[in-house]
Amino acid sequence: SLTGDAAMYDAGLEVAAAYVQVDSEIRPLLRGSIGLRYETADLSVKTLDIFAPTAAPIFSRSVSKDYLLPAATLTWNFAEDQQLRFGLSQTIGRPQFRELAPQRYRDTETDRILSGNPYLEDTTFVNVDARYEHYFSKGQYFTLGAFYKNMEKPVEALAVLGSDGAFRQTFYNAPAADIYGGEVEFKKLFELETGTGWVDNRRWLVSLNYTYTTSQLNVSDGDTITLDITGVPTTPTARDYLTGGEKLQGQSDHLANLQLGFENDEAGSQATLLVTYTSERVSARSSSVDLPDLVQRPGIRVDFVYRRNFEIQGREFTGSFEARNLTGTDAEEYQAAGGKRFDTNSFDIGQSFSLGLSARF
């Protein structure tokens, strides 16, 4: 954190909850479950003088909330190894302490000054999902799902340009948003018989996950947001900062993971090649609807990990080799408008290679 009047904070969350659930077979192959969770939470956050931590807090706020959270699922086992699952639930999401504490600190990942907003509220979710599941064997499956979420007061990041030309980031609750999309997962272990010892002696793995997500902010006339940029809370009109129909901050349309690997139990070796893709997303809102948002482009990344167990004089060792970011993908964050691009936090991540050795005692 940065030194200053409030370079330290103390925060706490105390939750008490009770739940009841009924699970029953409605008819052969059809099972239902319904439950209700009651939760009460006391949240407190205060900022302190680092040189006088026992003195009265510079700022203090406490909030108590009660929730009733219902949930229901319906599962149809229409085949021995296949089923359809439907779910409906209400859940909550709480801001992180660092998003709440009105204290400046430097984010080491973005090299940007961040300060929390103590007036953030919990996000409430209504979740609807449907999923088809096919299990080939233990730990091996194919699933296909669709989901919808309605969010009230989602937390978003806001980037404010300071007089020094650098961005300072804080947080706020957007009025509401809708998210919907689909997901496919596949995981398969198999052994090959090619007559080649190097191939035949290994158990091979293919794992794939792809998620498509789209979202939109819901902003109406009269909606406001609460900001704490200067130490004094303000409630500007939401339309000054947000446009209805925009994507949620932090949401990528496409997320994909491909994992290829093998295991050799006799040799004690394991290798994994991991390919990930994340499409562009809004990393932070700009301080006006007339200014472009900050956008990240994570792109494609490839990692490789190899491990092997061996013994030396009766002692067990594990050697490892790791290669990260083989594609050399750079970090990109920028604003774009009028066919021009201004990089706000773009840099070369580089590639990393490491060797490791561990002993078991």
Tell where the protein language model's regions lie, with residue ranges.
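Outer-membrane beta-barrel signature, preferentially recognizing the C-terminal barrel domain
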Residues: 9-14, 63, 92-143, 148-151, ...
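C-terminal beta-signal and adjacent terminal beta-strands/loops
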Residues: 276-286, 308-361
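Transmembrane beta-strands of outer-membrane beta-barrel proteins
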Residues: 32-36, 70, 84-86, 141-144, ...
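Outer-membrane beta-barrel channels and translocator barrels
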Residues: 27-29, 77-81, 125, 137, ...
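Residue-level signature of outer-membrane beta-barrel architecture
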Residues: 20-26, 66, 74-78, 90, ...
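Signature of Gram-negative outer-membrane beta-barrel scaffolds
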Residues: 1-81, 105
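Gram-negative outer-membrane beta-barrel transporters
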Residues: 146-151, 168-285, 358
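Outer-membrane beta-barrel translocator domains and adjoining extracellular loop/strand segments
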Residues: 44-52, 97-103, 110-112, 154-161, ...
